[in-house]
């Protein structure tokens, strides 16, 4: 299955409704510290796994998310580009329900993003 692009508000609603879904934030540690991170009531649903210069991304991902290949996994970065790469990478190893949050955490040229859409976040 191809990666599905969805906006942050739709992703948030799907994450809240699906207890088995995960959010994978692929931004850098500096971004997490300086800009903030998404907040979900179920802390186990948010995984912080930087994509940048991480040749072990696949192994790290599999060691953290040892779930069925049909688990819904949402990928987030600043504006939707790196998360799209990560989502495609994971889809190509067999995961069937990969979603790219296309407006990212901070937004892009077209959409506001997680933070500006007033979805839960924290420092």
Swiss-Prot record:
Protein's name according to its UniProt entry: Uncharacterized protein RP600
Record CDD domains: RHOD_1
UniProt-listed Pfam families: Rhodanese
Disulfide bonds: none
Natural source organism: Rickettsia prowazekii (strain Madrid E)
Family matches, as InterPro entries: Rhodanese-like_dom, Rhodanese-like_dom_sf, STR4-like
Residue ranges occupied by any Rhodanese domain in the UniProt entry: 17-117
Organism lineage string: Bacteria, Pseudomonadati, Pseudomonadota, Alphaproteobacteria, Rickettsiales
Source domain of life: Bacteria
């Amino acid at each position: 299955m191809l990666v599905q692009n969805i906006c942050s508000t739709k992703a948030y609603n799907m994450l809240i409704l699906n207890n088995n879904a995960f959010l994978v934030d692929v931004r850098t540690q500096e971004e997490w510290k300086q800009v903030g991170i998404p907040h979900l009531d179920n802390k186990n649903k948010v995984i912080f796994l930087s994509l940048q210069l991480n040749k072990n991304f696949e192994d790290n991902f599999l060691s953290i998310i040892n779930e069925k290949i049909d688990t819904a996994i949402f990928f987030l970065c600043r504006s939707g580009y790196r998360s799209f790469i990560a989502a495609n990478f994971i889809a190509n190893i067999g995961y069937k329900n990969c979603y790219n949050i296309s407006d990212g955490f901070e937004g892009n040229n077209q959409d506001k993003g997680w933070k500006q859409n007033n979805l839960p976040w924290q420092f």
